[in-house]
């Protein structure tokens, strides 16, 4: 994907609605659109979706997504959303992975840029729970054990501790820079 990949339908609104929410991130962020679209249908907000597969939503000069992310900054400047939601499959971009990595300094730089552009509310969505192994295979293995009764509401065995570490790191960043933080990890794991 390049900087011209975003369809106009994602960023051009025809309503006079001054309240705009901009969703920025990768394909994991795109999952949030359906829920946000509810508010758009109700006429409360215009929702602008700028998501690109495997592109961390941070300003970083050293990634293949740099041109695309610069375009996001330009679109924020021109559309003036009141809220920007930043979300992604953060565990892919953790510094230990082989993907374009995201580090704390680049995330802070990105948030600072949004503030300079006049965004009044920035929401950082943290990582979702993940497991060391394939979750469906773990459930099949568990179902074959003598302890099996019913599928568990929550499965903590085999849970990736890296998710907890990353969630704590991102929550600390959000607190440090004064933005809202939503933790799917804490919500889904009843923490």
How would you label these PLM feature ranges?
Residues 1-191:
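Extracellular/periplasmic envelope-modification machinery, especially enzymes
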């Amino acid at each position: 994907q390049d900087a011209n990949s975003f369809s106009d339908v994602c960023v051009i609104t025809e309503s006079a609605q001054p309240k705009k929410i901009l969703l920025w991130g990768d394909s994991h962020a795109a999952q949030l659109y359906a829920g946000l679209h509810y508010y758009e249908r109700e006429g409360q907000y215009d929702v602008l979706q700028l998501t690109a597969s495997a592109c961390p939503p941070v300003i970083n000069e050293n990634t293949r997504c740099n041109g695309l992310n610069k375009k996001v900054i330009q679109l924020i400047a021109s559309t003036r959303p009141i809220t920007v939601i930043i979300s992604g499959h953060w565990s892919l971009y953790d510094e230990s992975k082989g993907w374009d990595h995201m580090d704390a300094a680049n995330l802070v730089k990105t948030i600072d840029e949004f503030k300079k552009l006049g965004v009044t509310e920035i929401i950082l969505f943290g990582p979702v729970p993940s497991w060391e192994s394939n979750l469906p295979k773990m459930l099949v293995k568990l179902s074959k054990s003598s302890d099996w009764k019913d599928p568990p509401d929550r499965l903590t065995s085999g849970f990736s501790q890296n998710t907890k570490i990353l969630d704590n790191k991102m929550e600390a960043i959000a607190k440090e820079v004064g933005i809202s933080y939503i933790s799917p990890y804490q919500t889904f794991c009843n923490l």
